[in-house]
């Protein structure tokens, strides 16, 4: 990667080694206040203009396509509105060109009224185009206790309770989630890891961890199987053993999957899986992978294409490495990524527009003119989809590492082979990650995660943290704790069970970098107890 700078040492052109920066780079123009005013993406022939108010707050992002000057066609616009006396975001208006037509939605937030004994820094209502979608209730510690969904004139409550600890202290660790008629209950070990999950009082999952908080055993009543995981000293998975389901003493393993690491220089490089050889390029990108997958790469760590069962998929990205297009067997999907967030996509006549709440959670989407809602468990997995009236249309289940197990309709019928069913139209699954059906991988922005192996397919671009042994394995997913953690951009893990519950820490705000810094600088992104004591 190469850069050119202006007289103030600001990057104005970014380009790759073999490219001519004048016809294949990314160009940035700054305004008089030193803020980014214009961005030209020569690779994708897109031009993005940024507009600010007198307080230097970002108020509009407008993108054209097909021309790098003002002659391009409209592609997208994202406008922000703020409260008069604060920097709090009160609304955002999204307009996208999806295929041959445009879609426009305004999402607004209502904050607490101090005269009504409400917290003024908490959102109490979320609206779309003026219509009420979500109403929140909080306890005296600012924890969300209920989300009331407004659906087709009816109210559907989602209720939360929390775990208490000794010495009159409490936490934001979720104890129960009552969600669309199903109650999920959680218990934790002494380190705060999820120990059991029950659905409507019936035990579903039991988990065990080692002293490094790595998952070492999962007893899944839902799968009627138990699994044992072993690791080497560097945090590499050595084997997965499958047993008949039990929460007690294990019998004889019925299946063993072995992992191999034979590279003498790069000891964390997975070179074999279940007897299949895996090969890499010089910087640790896989070329031949499990189950016949083959891959090509560009610009360092960008996955350019993969082939499976004779079908080839290719991918394009923007300057930040975020995906803008994929083509699978000749079928093209275009993505609208603005401010680091995927707001919409279209494939032929299929159009999806994603809606976000005050915490930045994708909670609903518009598909070909109809509204659908996501149903989440406590860890942020998408476990269902409802229509605009709250009727369950789709359900998903996953194994401990996020591999999809079942895809059914609301009545429990298998629809995994029905590409047109809303369950398969929706790409967001485990932890809210984007699932690529063509590969079985999750796209986590900076790289791809393989739930089959429980590892990232290539190396992390961010080094480990001092004092955290597991973080130095740059292929390990969430330091081998897939139950309690999530990694939204493939670079750092966070506590999954705490997100989306706090009122102030995760407010949506223009600027994905600002959101990331806010998350990284929280009292402890790993410890729910430190949020409220």
Feature roles, as predicted:
Residues 1-8, 13-20, 38-44, 48-50, ...:
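Beta-turn initiation residues at beta-strand->coil junctions
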Residues 3, 90, 111-115, 159-166, ...:
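A motif-centric feature for acidic-aromatic and gly/ser/thr-rich catalytic loops and repeats
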Residues 3, 28, 50, 80, ...:
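A residue-level detector for well-ordered beta-strand positions
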Residues 6, 31, 53, 83-84, ...:
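Short, acidic, Ser/Thr-enriched surface-loop or helix-capping motifs
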Residues 9, 34, 56, 86-87, ...:
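Glycine-centered positions in the ABC transporter ATPase nucleotide-binding domain
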Residues 24, 76, 105-106, 133, ...:
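Low-complexity, glycine/serine/proline-rich disordered segments
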Residues 323, 385, 403-413, 447-457, ...:
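Short, low-complexity export/processing leader segments characterized by acidic and small residues
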Residues 465-470:
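Short linker/helix segments within small regulatory modules
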